[in-house]
């Protein structure tokens, strides 16, 4: 599971870089609601990545120990997305729904880019 932890921390670092860029955008541009929405969505997306990594670790340990396998936490990730939607709908003067949804998708985009980057890097080393 060390490889999973390394991948997780690499992806967290990328997401934190994006959050820093969004924070700069919030502070220095007139698009405050857009960047605040991106910050909200990406922050919740970061929680989703942490939750997914933790559940995958527990899942792997249960399989290795031949114990009963639990779910991977889809319901908890859906609840986090619903929480973001409730916040956006409660405070429409501060948030927009589209940038929040884009922020929620950020972790999955980072995972895909990270996968292809490391696949390309490993293929380059083996060639």
From Swiss-Prot:
Keywords: Cell membrane, CF(0), Hydrogen ion transport, Ion transport, Membrane, Transmembrane, Transmembrane helix, Transport. One of its GO terms (biological process) is proton transmembrane transport. The keyword Cell membrane applies. It is a multi-pass membrane protein. Its main location: membrane. It is found in: Cell membrane. Signal peptide: none annotated. The keyword Membrane applies. Disulfide bonds: none annotated. One of its GO terms (cellular component) is plasma membrane. It comes from the Bacteria. Pfam families: ATP-synt_I. The chain crosses the membrane at residues 11-31, 34-54, 72-92, 97-117. A possible function for this protein is to guide the assembly of the membrane sector of the ATPase enzyme complex. Belongs to the bacterial AtpI family. This is ATP synthase protein I. It comes from Bacillus sp. (strain PS3). The gene is atpI.
């Amino acid at each position: 599971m060390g490889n999973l932890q390394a991948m997780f921390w690499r992806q967290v670092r990328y997401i934190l870089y994006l959050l820093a860029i969004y924070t700069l955008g919030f502070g220095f541009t007139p698009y405050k609601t857009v960047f605040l929405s991106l910050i909200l969505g990406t922050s919740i997306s970061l929680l989703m990545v942490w939750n997914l990594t933790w559940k995958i670790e527990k899942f792997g340990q249960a399989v290795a120990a031949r114990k009963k396998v639990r779910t991977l936490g889809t319901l908890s990730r859906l609840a986090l997305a619903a929480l973001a939607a409730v916040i956006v709908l409660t405070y429409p003067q501060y948030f927009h729904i589209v940038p929040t949804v884009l922020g929620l998708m950020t972790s999955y985009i980072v995972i895909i880019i990270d996968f292809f980057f490391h696949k390309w890097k490993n293929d380059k080393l083996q060639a």
